[in-house]
Amino acid sequence: SKPMDIVFLSNGETGAEENWEHLQRITKNIPNRVVRVDGVDGRIQAYHASAEASETPWAFTVFAKLKVSPKFDFNWQPDRMQQPKHYIFEAKNPVNGLVYGHQAMIAYNKELTLANYGYGLDFTLDDEHASVPLLSGIAQYNTDEFSTWRTAFREVIKLLVDDTEISKKRLEAWLNEAN
């Protein structure tokens, strides 16, 4: 299969330039096409612009707050025999130590992304999705007090709504670690 595009999505985040330059360095010797979508206001509009920038049916979407692991395997491919879905990789949270899909790289399916207008609580989780236990990098959301609070607030709301044991354990870590 053709290597999937890599789309770096940014909109003025602290650390975006450093993470973009880092991504360019670690991908310079691989065949994947790497593009940047920058400055699109609105979450849904940014996701749509990122899908439109991709020339492959799925694309690795790297959010500006993620410092991508140089060990991430960009040869990874989605299971094309299954129903189309988004694939959520893992990221390490430097504040509470959790490792799961929060702030991680996502392999977005282009058609699903363009058909989603964000009517639910979470754009990615509104469509079919699967977790992939591959570490994509370190989430660097804790750059200032407001960004840290806003990111934590959004994630805690999602965890509160998802009444599963794993979400309850993650919620406890968010509420108790590093406070």
Located regions from the model:
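N-terminal anchoring/stem segment of glycosyltransferases
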Residues: S1-A53
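Active-site ExK catalytic segment of metal-dependent nucleases
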Residues: F8, F63-K65, E90
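Secondary-structure boundary/capping signal
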Residues: P31-V35, W58, L121
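Short acidic, S/G/P-rich loop/turn micro-motifs used as interaction or catalytic elements
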Residues: N11-A16, L66-S69, N93-N96, L112-A115
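Acidic donor-diphosphate engagement hotspot in glycosyltransferases and nucleotidyltransferases
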Residues: K71-D73
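Catalytic-site signature of metal-activated, phosphate-bearing donor transferases
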Residues: S1, N75-N179
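Short beta-strand-to-loop acidic/aromatic patch adjacent to the donor-nucleotide binding site
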Residues: S50, P57-S69
